[in-house]
Every structure is written in C-alpha cells, then in structure tokens.
A protein has these predicted regions:
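N-terminal amphipathic, basic helical "cap/leader" segment at the start of enzyme domains
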Residues: 2-115, 121-122
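Small-aliphatic-rich amphipathic alpha-helix that forms the alpha element of a beta-alpha
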Residues: 74-75, 117, 131-160
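Short acidic/His/Gly/Ser-rich catalytic and metal-binding motifs that mark active-site loops
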Residues: 125-128
Length: 160
C-alpha cells in the first residue's frame, strides 16, 4: 500500500471519528436543553387521549391503596352547588363480582376483574337551596371520568 492511500485511509478514519464525536455532542446538548419532565398540560392531554375502555383484564391484583386513590380522584370531581351526590361502592370480592357479572348483562367483564368501583347517584341529596339535586347524573359522570383518568394514569384498565 502506498503512502498516499494510507494517508487517505487515515484521513477518512479521523473524519469519521470527528463526525461521530460531533453527532454525540449535538445529541448530548439537545438532551441537556430539553426539560426532564413534560409540562403538566402535555401530560394531562396525553392521559386524556390515551384513555380507552378496557373490558378484558389481567389477574394482576389491585391494592387497597390503588382503590383508595381511584375513589379520591373521583371525589375530587366538581359538582353543582357542591352537593357531591354520589356513593362509591368498592367491590374486591371475586364471588360478589362473579354474581354481579351473571346478573348484569352489560357487566360480564366483572367476572375477570380484580376489583370494581360502582359509582352510584344519591338522588336524595339536597342542594343548598333545600331542593333535590338536579345535576346528580352530571356530577356522577364527572366523578366517573376522574376515576377513569386516574386509572389510566396508574396503568389500570377500566371501563365506564
């Protein structure tokens, strides 16, 4: 191999090494200038857009702490005149869920679920003006959506 060819090969190897170093530097700087965490608004929107109804479940247990978190999220929903016309029934008894699945035609998925939370509207709750709450269905719907979004954020499958 002549000296001119050796020089070209060494120059090419050095150029490739320099290019690789520059690419690494640019990538490192780009990563350093990007925020470590996504803005809260982006995280919330991503959670809203990724939420979907899940009707087929794994056998992964759902802890009492997770169920409590879901109920807390539901209870944080807004309500008309702050009536909070809801009751939450947490069901984690497999036998009870299988019985409900057998009786409720649109809840067959309960037979496979590890737990369930029933959101019940309490129509006897009175508004501040002493009249029965007219918004109980809307209020319970908002609570249910909070619960579903929290389940999505926790990596749990859920359905309305």
């Amino acid at each position: 191999m002549n000296d001119a060819l050796k020089y070209k090969i060494v120059s090419l190897v050095l150029a490739i090494g320099l290019l690789a170093s520059l690419i690494h530097l640019v990538v490192s700087q780009k990563q350093a200038t990007q925020p470590e965490h996504k803005p809260a608004a982006e995280i919330v929107m991503q959670n809203i857009l990724s939420r979907k109804s899940v009707r087929s479940y794994t056998n992964r247990p759902v802890s009492r702490a997770q169920l409590d978190t879901l109920v807390r999220a539901a209870m944080a929903a807004p309500t008309g005149m702050d009536t909070r016309p809801w009751k939450f029934v947490v069901i984690d008894n497999k036998n009870a869920m299988q019985q409900l699945a057998a009786k409720l035609p649109r809840a067959k998925m309960l037979a496979e679920a590890q737990a369930a939370i029933a959101v019940c509207g309490d129509m006897s709750v009175l508004s501040k003006d002493g009249k029965p709450s007219r918004n109980w269905m809307l209020d319970c719907s908002a609570a249910t959506e909070n619960l579903l979004l929290q389940a999505e954020a926790m990596g749990l499958g859920a359905v309305w």
